[in-house]
């Protein structure tokens, strides 16, 4: 069996620790189970106009100058952070060689038996663009494959009637459904006849020894990083 993993990971606003770690952890867990897998290098619809390296360039034209001065103080720290994140993805992830957006992904010829939509807030509809089809396995290239959600998150649940209907329809794509939060599990169950299971965040599938293998001892001392 070969598994394709799709989620928010490499492309997230504000270079999120959680986004980087959950897909890493899930891939490592599958490796431990002897399951062949690869992370799909997927650029979500809502990130196509966002510049992770130079965030101020993502602003509307009238806001760019004002936001430039806001970001000026963060320019070099953000650039350093960006490079470290990209290095993590390049060295710790096993990803597809090609970057896919929704249009390209819909035409992809994958040899996956199973697609897993994995963790993070992948089921939250964008304010203007709605749900991302890639995160619901709602693309032609994914037809005929086993489709699973693992620890998916919805975020806010105040859907319009139109989006409620769309959410119900998109859930039909999945063969198995699991959600990260209890509230999200209960909410999702209202929109499908399939059982919805509440599961652990992927980062908790590994133990301390697994993370110790990739930890880099900091040069600086006397501080504490809290990952919540």
Predicted regions and their residues:
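Nucleotide-sugar donor-binding and catalytic loop/hinge architecture
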Residues: 1, 111, 140-144, 211-223
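Aromatic- and Gly/Pro-rich donor/ligand-binding loops
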Residues: 3-169
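A short helix->loop->beta-strand "cap" motif at the edges of active sites that frequently abuts
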Residues: 143-147, 175, 193-194
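Glycine-rich phosphate-binding "P-loop"
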Residues: 149-157, 197-207
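Acidic anion/phosphate-binding donor-loop and adjacent secondary structure
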Residues: 157-162, 204-217
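A short beta-strand/loop micro-motif in the catalytic core of glycosyltransferases
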Residues: 174-181
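Helix-loop-beta element that forms the nucleotide-linked donor phosphate-binding surface
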Residues: 185-203
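A conserved active-site cap/scaffold subdomain adjacent to cofactor or substrate pockets
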Residues: 225-227
């Amino acid at each position: 069996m070969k598994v394709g993993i799709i989620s928010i990971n490499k492309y997230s606003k504000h270079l999120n620790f959680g986004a980087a770690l959950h897909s890493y952890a899930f891939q490592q867990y599958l490796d431990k189970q002897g399951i062949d897998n690869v992370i799909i290098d997927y650029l979500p619809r809502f990130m196509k106009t966002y510049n992770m390296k130079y965030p101020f360039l993502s602003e509307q034209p009238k806001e760019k100058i004002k936001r430039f001065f806001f970001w000026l103080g963060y320019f070099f720290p953000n650039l350093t952070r960006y490079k470290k994140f990209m290095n993590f993805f390049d060295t710790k992830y096993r990803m597809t060689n090609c970057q896919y957006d929704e249009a390209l992904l819909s035409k992809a010829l994958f040899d996956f038996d199973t697609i897993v939509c994995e963790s993070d807030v992948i089921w939250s509809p964008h304010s203007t663009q709605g749900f991302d089809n890639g995160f619901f396995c709602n693309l032609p290239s994914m037809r005929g494959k086993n489709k699973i959600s693992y620890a998916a998150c919805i975020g806010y649940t105040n859907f319009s009637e139109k989006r409620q209907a769309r959410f119900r329809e998109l859930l039909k794509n999945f063969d198995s459904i699991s959600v990260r939060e209890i509230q999200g599990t209960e909410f999702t169950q209202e929109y499908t006849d399939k059982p919805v299971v509440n599961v652990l965040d992927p980062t908790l599938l590994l133990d301390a020894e697994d993370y110790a293998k990739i930890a880099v001892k900091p040069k600086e001392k006397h501080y504490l990083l809290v990952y919540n």
